[in-house]
A protein has these predicted regions:
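Hydrophobic, aromatic-lined core segments that form the binding pocket/scaffold
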Residues: 1-154
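Cys/His-clustered metal-coordination modules, chiefly Zn-binding fingers
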Residues: 133-184
């Protein structure tokens, strides 16, 4: 099944409601991009424990609850880089929507450390969808991005401001210029 077909299947199974539909779109985009047919690969890509993934996916896509239940029994040890854990902590400290925000915090934290622009790492269609995600789920943090920095650069800068540490993210495009302007 292609990524586009997985996305369509997930969206057909999404819970009704405007804001939930937007959340479902963001999560379905990430899941469709990450899913390779292997539960362990999906869980690893999403950056949460199997039980957490099954819970939030069942919440957003109730018609597929039975399918996601298989993730609960998955024997999988989640591994995360120290920067990813710091980013996740920063994001969850500003999360506003419960289980969905926690999943998105894990996705964003993992995506920041990957090479593509963050919106692409999350499987989104454009940077505007990432902006919406940050405003909706991490409003307090998003409000601090007053210089319109790229999100990877902003989150790395926020980590540095928060705890004085560095973030080893791969910055791309405008993220590079924005980070270079504020990092030192």
């Amino acid at each position: 099944m292609s990524s586009a077909e997985r996305y369509v299947s997930l969206m057909r199974a999404a819970r009704a409601g405007v804001s939930e539909g937007l959340d479902a779109h963001v999560v379905a985009s990430a899941v469709a991009a990450a899913a390779t047919g292997d539960g362990a690969a999906l869980v690893d890509s999403l950056g949460l424990e199997p039980e957490q993934v099954a819970t939030v996916l069942s919440e957003l896509f109730p018609a597929l609850t039975e399918m996601f239940a298989r993730l609960r029994g998955l024997n999988f040890e989640l591994r995360a880089e120290p920067d990813e854990l710091r980013l996740r902590e920063l994001l969850t400290g500003h999360a506003s929507q419960g289980n969905v925000s926690n999943l998105l915090a894990a996705l964003v934290a993992r995506g920041v450390l990957r090479p593509l622009p963050l919106w692409r790492e999350l499987g989104l269609s454009n940077p505007g969808e990432l902006e919406w995600l940050m405003q909706r789920h991490f409003a307090g943090l998003a409000a601090r991005n007053t210089h319109d920095m790229g999100w990877k650069a902003f989150l790395c800068d926020a980590l540095r401001s928060n705890d004085g540490g560095f973030c080893l993210a791969t910055l791309t495009g405008t993220d590079d210029a924005a980070f270079a302007a504020t990092a030192f």
